[in-house]
Amino acid sequence: SAMLNNVGYAKAVEDILGVSIPDRAIFMRVILGELARIIDHEVCLGAMFVDMGALTNYWYLYNPREKIYNFLSRLTGARFTNSFARIGGMAHDFYDGWQSELLGYLKEVEKGIDDTLTLVEKNRIFLDRVQNICKISAEDALSYGFTGPNLRASGVDYDLRKDKPYYYYDSFDFNIPVGSCGDIHDRMFVRFYEMKES
């Protein structure tokens, strides 16, 4: 989440100081934030699949993720601990050819998601390991301070991008996946569907 943390810090300082940023910087932050969301979800899901002994699914998610890390490295100079947002904007603009390169990577990400879902959506062994296991109710999730996909997996329809929109998120058409019973299955599938929305 380095990119999201970097953007969150810059936005907080900008809000405190009353600094506005150019639209170009806003859209760069949205794009990079959504990429960070995809990478984070792939890490969570990939680690879960490794723990379950499902290495094929791990590679379907991790191989495209590596290409996004390479994109971030080329753009920011670092794969993981990138710091690219600056108070008042960004360090620099995207490089030439970034758009077609990134669209190619995103097609691979989507294929990895689809291939993984094909393997697990109706797989009885997988479903036995994740459905109705470690249920967390909406009330408990709120009481424990859950946020993000774990909160939404417990049935709480709350996402800052929709509920307190910033950076023009109110002008984007996207859905917020929400779970129904808060089990491992819901926590995993909320992440799958959020990646597709990103």
Predicted segments with their positions:
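Active-site bordering "gate/hinge" segments
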Residues: S1-S198
